[in-house]
Amino acid sequence: MTDLDSSLPPSVRTAGDSWTITELVGATALGVAAARAAETAGPDPLIRDEFAGLLVSSASPAWARLADPELSWLDDDPHGKRAHRVGIDYQAVRTHYFDEYFDGALRAGIRQVVILAAGLDSRAYRLNWPAGTTVYEIDQPKVLEYKTETLQRHGATPAAVRRPVPVDLRDDWPAALTAAGFQAARPTAWLAEGLLPYLPSDAQDRLFEMVTALSAAGSQVAVEVFGMNSRSNAQRWLRMRERLGLDVNVAALTYHEPDRSDAAAWLARHGWRVHSVDNRDEMARLGRPVPEDLSDEAVRSTLLRAHLGGSTG
């Protein structure tokens, strides 16, 4: 169960809602990609995502400005610039964490990957996948279409067999995944990055139930679990709205439900061996510590990996 911030606005989400890349939840994928683009273009980058900038700049000039590694749109706001830089650091660290997760899964012999709510994730294009690896990307149809068409237009080709699965995770996504060629008898590496707050609590439980049901022994899953009482996203997006005209209220796009299951505890109860790390500990480990005076504005989350039977890799 998660503590909720009583100042959070009510969710504007509705059953069956959908979006393009610049609308609702789709726009959050652009914000995350902009952070990866800024990190990649900056000095001594922790991760390299050469496709993020293409995906962001193709959306609009305002989104392209957001990806500026110098954060020139915040030149007259030193505090806002420092706080936004910490947000970019967080995105870089979580990307690094999940990149390492996939490296470990591949070393363990897994060749079937499912990215849940893939958004503008470009791992199918940028990671060094062994021959025979298939990457399934599940997300809203228009979001996947935007990514595919944009990268094709720039001549990018996947580094693995990439199979988009256009379906809402609140619907019967296992059927769509199976229809795309997924084989439940093979070990799978699953990823749920930046996803859980955008699902109702019952849909989160169903998601984990289906992931478990579809996972052969030796499968792995990685999950990002947010602290729902953090105001960091709201403040970050407020600056973006005021400075760049990007009208996205992330807090209103998430589900604020006090009875949401604890992901690590749920997985442990259902046969997964879980290892987790506090995002701030991981940021410090990788040389991107959160400054003490910005602690209240920085993201709080848990990054976890879990294994189902078989080798832990």
Swiss-Prot record:
Keywords in alphabetical order: Methyltransferase, S-adenosyl-L-methionine, Transferase
Any one GO BP annotation for this protein: methylation
GO molecular function (one): methyltransferase activity
Domain of life: Bacteria
EC number: 2.1.1.-
First-level EC class: transferase
Positions annotated to bind S-adenosyl-L-methionine: 139, 168-169
Pfam family, one: LCM
Entries under InterPro entries matching the protein: Ppm1/Ppm2/Tcmp, SAM-dependent_MTases_sf, SAM_mthyl_Trfase_ML2640-like
PANTHER family listed in its UniProt record: S-ADENOSYL-L-METHIONINE-DEPENDENT METHYLTRANSFERASE YKTD-RELATED, S-ADENOSYL-L-METHIONINE-DEPENDENT METHYLTRANSFERASES SUPERFAMILY PROTEIN
NCBIfam families: mthyl_TIGR00027
Similarity comment: Belongs to the UPF0677 family.
Record's function text: Exhibits S-adenosyl-L-methionine-dependent methyltransferase activity.
Protein name (Swiss-Prot/TrEMBL): Putative S-adenosyl-L-methionine-dependent methyltransferase MAP_3563
Phylogenetic classification of the source organism: Bacteria, Bacillati, Actinomycetota, Actinomycetes, Mycobacteriales
